[in-house]
């Protein structure tokens, strides 16, 4: 936990933000894997 998850949970569009963050993380892992 950090302050970032707290801010994300406060945003009305947290869902979309969470999905976006997950996609970014997945892209990061994919780039690191290749």
Curated annotation (Swiss-Prot):
Keyword presence, Protease: yes
Top-rank taxon: Eukaryota
EC number: 3.5.1.26
GO molecular function: N4-(beta-N-acetylglucosaminyl)-L-asparaginase activity; peptidase activity
Record field: catalytic activity: N(4)-(beta-N-acetyl-D-glucosaminyl)-L-asparagine + H2O = N-acetyl-beta-D-glucosaminylamine + L-aspartate + H(+)
Alphabetical keyword list: Autocatalytic cleavage, Hydrolase, Lysosome, Protease
GO biological process, one term: proteolysis
UniProt modification remark: Cleaved into an alpha and beta chain by autocatalysis; this activates the enzyme. The N-terminal residue of the beta subunit is responsible for the nucleophile hydrolase activity. N-glycosylated.
Active site: 18 (nucleophile)
Compartment(s): Lysosome
Tagged with keyword Hydrolase: yes
Cellular compartments per GO CC: lysosome
Assembly and oligomerization: Heterotetramer of two alpha and two beta chains arranged as a dimer of alpha/beta heterodimers.
Family to which this protein belongs: Belongs to the Ntn-hydrolase family.
Function: Cleaves the GlcNAc-Asn bond which joins oligosaccharides to the peptide of asparagine-linked glycoproteins.
Name assigned to this protein: N(4)-(Beta-N-acetylglucosaminyl)-L-asparaginase
Gene name, Swiss-Prot/TrEMBL: AGA
């Amino acid at each position: 936990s950090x302050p970032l998850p707290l801010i994300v949970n406060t945003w009305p569009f947290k869902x979309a933000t969470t999905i976006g963050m997950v996609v970014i993380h997945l892209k990061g892992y994919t780039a690191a894997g290749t």
